[in-house]
A protein has these predicted regions:
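A contiguous loop/helix-start segment that scaffolds small-molecule binding in enzyme catalytic cores
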Residues: 5-12, 46-48, 52-157
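Short glycine-cluster motifs
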Residues: 1-56
Length: 157
């Protein structure tokens, strides 16, 4: 389970004595990127990736995130559910040292027939989210693997 309610739902089922079966799947942070022609890792660009939630249960950006560590320690960031806080997230990453020219992909409605992928950069991502009217759920991908989108998918929507 990645940043969802799966664990809490399983706990409720166990507490209620309900038998259930977990069916494994592929998280949007992998499947959505693949569908957009963006590898999560590539031997030529990164040996690490960090998955981050864009908001907590209360709806705020997680206070415990170490933006300096994230900015310097992970070449590729995959941010789930961050559209509402994209202004703050992009600002914090740039303040922590990521350049405004850093490649960014915004993937709306990942792995559905309505998936829409827009590539941009960290400095312009908020404007592009509004310009292309991208709606949640949305993934925000920051890093060099974003450059593969046009090459592997053959399009930018």
């Amino acid at each position: 389970f990645v940043f969802g309610r799966g664990a809490q739902e399983c706990e409720a089922l166990v507490a209620a004595g309900v038998n259930f079966c977990i069916v494994p799947g592929i998280t949007a942070g992998i499947g959505g990127l693949a569908y957009a022609g963006i590898p999560v890792t590539s031997r030529d660009t990164n040996a690490a990736v960090t998955f981050i939630t864009g908001h907590t249960v209360s709806g705020d950006v997680p206070a415990a995130l170490d933006w300096d560590c994230l900015s310097k320690g992970s070449p590729v960031l995959v941010i789930y559910m961050g559209s509402r806080h994209l202004v703050r997230i992009s600002k914090r990453l740039m303040e922590a040292g990521r350049p405004s020219s850093e490649p960014v992909a915004l993937i709306s409605k990942a792995t559905t027939p309505h998936q829409k992928t827009v590539t941009t950069n960290l400095g312009d991502c908020v404007a592009h989210m509004k310009e292309y009217d991208l709606k949640p759920p949305m993934l925000i991908i920051v890093g060099p693997t974003v450059a593969y989108h046009k090459k592997f998918s053959g399009k930018d929507q």
